[in-house]
């Protein structure tokens, strides 16, 4: 019989040649397509599914197996020509599709009535396998190939026909009982596997040829006794010791008249016999029990045949359920790969749009619809395979598609987060600047315990440097410094979190602000919660990265950063106005507070204490109706800013002794290279340590030099600005001008005029003298004088209000016209924007306290 070619469809294929080689899978696939629908219908195998059957035939050589199949199924298997020779005709195994008798179906259609006629379906495709005959001289006593074919037939065929001559019933060799013994053994081998389904047993159809008796029952009984005897003599597993042959086979019997002597009767019997295969209404219909079939989808048959034959030829233990499991995994893997490749193409198109900066409306919805379509296609392609394998692969496919979707959404979110970060750049910078300004003002209030009495020291121009060193002996309140560092980072954390909280909000009050943050993407993503979640996460990561880089830059230039704070604390008041010193005592008193403020900021630069931690979300928010798989994962990844506070980090601070010595570095703290993000880990993350021990020492000494130089310049300004009269001038003026002074004191009108003139023309001088009074006099006197001046100012506003008071106090207050340098990554300075002015009483109390501490 001619083999099947990939280009030309003939009536059958030589499935296994006489050398034991199976036809390639591609050729088997082409044959199946051609046999089912002809060329150009590549999806016919998928549409066929498991709706087909396979029938195989076994028997002795030259026993008429091919003749039986040709008569029964109208096939064209090659038959023996007795006129020329008797010998082997079928070598290996041939396969073709049966041509069912049109007369049978026409008869059924004629018997059908009404709706039954319309509902009647075409018969399912039937493939026929013609195996090489046994007991041939060509193979001799070699039964290995015979056993391989038997095992292959039982693993493929739903029904196995045993072709036997009626006259050989009751014989052993002539009836080919060796073949039956082989069939029983290999089928028992298949059934011995624990994964084998007991109901899935093949049908063994015994056909007695050339039967001339009237009653076939005695012959059937004899055949059954022969089967039972063979079954009893074979070695069985323990679980089948007491089992009968019916456990592993569904035995059926049929007799046919003599092919030559009773040809009309033979043809009639064959026609009736055919109904067993094609007519569901027939009481002997062979395909009524679906659990008996192999259940291999048509599109997986080539792979299944190849796997089974390879396992048989390699002498492996053939397990049909395992083979079906392997086939299911193979087909599911192919379908999964096709779905992933298709989704990759979709992702590539979207990636190009993202790189171009295009706005993609309803992005998540489009991706979800694509994934749902691919999952449905996968389900349709694999629904006929093993359910557990399909379910497992479908879950893996959904997870992989979800990962790809999430990656693409994050990529899109990052492109939008660039716009959001640009809009929030000022917020990020101001959070640090505000924290530094707060620290600068509050650190001045840290109590210093004097370690040396320097009240009697006088600093002249020549002994300036030594005087500065002598005053820098204050002991630092270490506990309060640590609290300031903690509060510094908490303020930054709260400021940033407050700015980023609205990115996760969807209230109407936030929509206007969000629109300005999202820019051109606002309209497209306001209704896309998954993208908004991704943008919020990406923006927070970007802010964390940007903020950390800024502190790294500040730490790299720590001396200049700390010196800027020292300089601003020294030359400005707590309300932001400029402070001018008239005396060296006032300057040296403020210098200790300013130096303390710089040291506390240095403690803040030791360790970067912010991190992103997951946020617990409500189950309803994650699993609510309409929630996409991408949104569920993004919501679970929602995070917030938090100050690092594990046990080791709570103690990882600089220890200050006094303002003139290098702070003690916490060298004993355990560190770890990998940041686990676990707040319970008792380690310090080495990547977040901004200042090493050596860097701290270098920064402190350089800062001290800069601070000393700044102090010297301020002292020189004070010394150069001193304008004082000789001590003898005032007594002489009082003595010589006593008469004029007496006349002035006794004339109220003239006295009032002189006071008004002095206030108007000597206001600046009087203020400077008041500042000198504040710096040199005791605190009780300063407070009393300022209280008196405040009462006078209140009386003036009550009885002679100025234009500013009449206008509601809208007059401009004094501020330093020069802008101070801000703390940035480049200069590591501190921005000094003017804060709201404190009340006069509060300012007096604060300055008085400073003087008292001095």
From Swiss-Prot:
Q: Where is the composition biased (Basic and acidic residues)?
A: 845-854
The record, for Gene3D superfamilies, names: P-loop containing nucleotide triphosphate hydrolases (3.40.50.300)
Q: Which residues form a coiled coil?
A: 336-386
Q: Which GO terms describe its molecular function?
A: GTP binding; GTPase activity
Transmembrane intervals: 725-745, 749-769
In the bilayer, the protein is annotated as: Multi-pass membrane protein
> Which family is it part of?
Belongs to the TRAFAC class dynamin-like GTPase superfamily. GB1/RHD3 GTPase family. RHD3 subfamily.
Give the protein's recorded name.
Answer: Protein SEY1 homolog
The record lists the organism as: Trypanosoma brucei brucei (strain 927/4 GUTat10.1)
């Amino acid at each position: 019989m001619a083999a099947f070619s990939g280009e030309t469809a003939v009536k059958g294929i030589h499935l296994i040649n006489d050398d034991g080689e199976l036809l390639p899978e591609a050729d088997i696939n082409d044959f199946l397509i051609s046999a089912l629908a002809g060329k150009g219908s590549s999806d016919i195998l998928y549409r066929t599914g498991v709706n087909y059957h396979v029938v195989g035939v076994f028997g002795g050589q030259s026993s008429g197996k091919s003749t039986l199949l040709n008569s029964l199924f109208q096939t064209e298997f090659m038959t023996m020509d007795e006129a020329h020779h008797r010998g082997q005709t079928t070598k290996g195994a041939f396969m073709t599709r049966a041509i069912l008798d049109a007369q049978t179906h026409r008869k059924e259609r004629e018997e059908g009535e009404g709706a039954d006629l319309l509902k009647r379906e075409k018969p399912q495709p039937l493939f026929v396998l013609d195996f090489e005959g046994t007991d041939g001289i060509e193979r001799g006593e070699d039964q290995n190939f015979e056993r391989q074919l038997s095992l292959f037939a039982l693993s493929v065929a739903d029904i196995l026909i045993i072709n036997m001559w009626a006259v050989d019933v009751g014989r052993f060799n002539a009836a080919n009982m060796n073949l039956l013994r082989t069939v029983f053994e290999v089928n028992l081998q298949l059934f011995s596997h624990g994964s084998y389904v007991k109901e899935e047993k093949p049908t063994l159809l015994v056909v007695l040829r050339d039967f001339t008796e009237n009653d076939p029952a005695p012959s059937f009984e004899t055949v059954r006794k022969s089967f039972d005897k063979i079954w009893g003599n074979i070695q069985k597993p323990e679980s089948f010791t007491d089992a009968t042959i019916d456990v592993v086979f569904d035995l059926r019997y049929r007799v046919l008249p003599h092919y030559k002597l009773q040809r009309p009767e033979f043809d009639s019997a064959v026609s009736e016999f055919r109904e067993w295969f094609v007519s569901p209404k027939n009481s002997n219909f062979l395909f009524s029990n679906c659990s008996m079939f192999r259940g291999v989808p048509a599109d997986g048959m080539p792979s299944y045949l190849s796997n089974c034959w390879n396992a048989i030829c390699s002498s492996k233990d053939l397990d049909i359920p395992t083979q079906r499991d392997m086939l299911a995994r193979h087909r599911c893997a192919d379908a999964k790969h096709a779905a992933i490749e298709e989704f990759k193409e979709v992702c590539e198109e979207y990636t190009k749009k993202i790189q171009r900066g295009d706005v993609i409306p309803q992005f998540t919805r489009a991706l979800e619809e694509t994934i749902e379509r691919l999952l449905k296609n996968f389900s349709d392609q694999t629904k006929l395979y093993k359910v557990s394998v399909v379910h497992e692969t479908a879950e893996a496919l959904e997870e992989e598609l979800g990962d790809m979707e999430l990656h693409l959404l994050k990529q899109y979110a990052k492109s939008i987060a660039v716009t959001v970060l640009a809009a929030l750049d000022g917020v990020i910078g101001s959070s640090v600047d505000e924290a530094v300004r707060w620290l600068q003002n509050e650190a001045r209030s840290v109590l210093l315990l004097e370690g040396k009495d320097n009240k009697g020291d006088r600093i002249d121009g020549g002994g300036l440097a030594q005087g500065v060193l002598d005053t820098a002996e204050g002991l630092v309140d270490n506990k309060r410094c640590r609290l300031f560092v903690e509060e510094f980072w908490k303020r930054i954390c709260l400021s940033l979190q407050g700015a980023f909280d609205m990115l996760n909000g969807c209230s109407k009050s936030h929509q206007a602000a969000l629109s300005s943050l999202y820019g051109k993407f606002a309209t497209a993503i306001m209704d896309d919660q998954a993208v908004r979640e991704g943008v919020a996460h990406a923006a927070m990561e970007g802010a964390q990265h940007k903020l950390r880089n800024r502190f790294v830059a500040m730490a790299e230039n720590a001396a200049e950063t700390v010196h800027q704070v020292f300089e601003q604390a020294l030359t400005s008041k707590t309300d932001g106005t400029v402070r001018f010193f008239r005396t060296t005592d006032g300057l040296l008193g403020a210098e200790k507070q300013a130096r303390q403020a710089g040291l506390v900021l240095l403690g803040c630069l030791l360790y970067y204490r912010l991190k992103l931690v997951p946020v617990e979300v409500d189950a309803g928010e994650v699993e609510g109706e309409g929630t996409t798989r991408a949104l569920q994962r993004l919501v679970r990844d929602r995070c917030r800013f938090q100050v690092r506070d594990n046990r080791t980090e709570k103690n990882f601070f600089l220890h200050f002794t006094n303002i003139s010595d290098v702070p003690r570095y916490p060298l004993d703290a355990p560190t770890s290279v990998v940041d686990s993000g676990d707040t319970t880990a008792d380690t310090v993350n080495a990547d977040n340590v901004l200042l090493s021990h050596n860097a701290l020492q270098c920064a402190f000494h350089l800062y001290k030099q800069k601070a000393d130089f700044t102090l010297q310049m301020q002292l020189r300004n004070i010394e150069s600005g001193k304008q004082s009269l000789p001590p003898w001038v005032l007594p002489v003026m009082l003595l010589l001008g006593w008469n004029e002074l007496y006349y002035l004191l006794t004339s109220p009108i003239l006295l009032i005029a002189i006071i008004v003139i002095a206030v108007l023309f000597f206001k600046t001088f009087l203020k400077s003298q008041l500042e000198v009074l504040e710096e040199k006099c005791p605190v009780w006197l300063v407070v009393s004088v300022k209280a008196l001046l405040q009462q006078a100012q209140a009386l003036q506003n009550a009885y002679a209000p100025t234009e500013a008071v009449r206008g509601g106090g809208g007059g401009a207050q004094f501020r330093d016209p020069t802008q101070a340098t801000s703390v940035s990554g480049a200069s590591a300075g501190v921005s000094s924007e003017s804060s709201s002015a404190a009340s006069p009483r509060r300012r007096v109390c604060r300055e008085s306290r400073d003087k008292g501490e001095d």
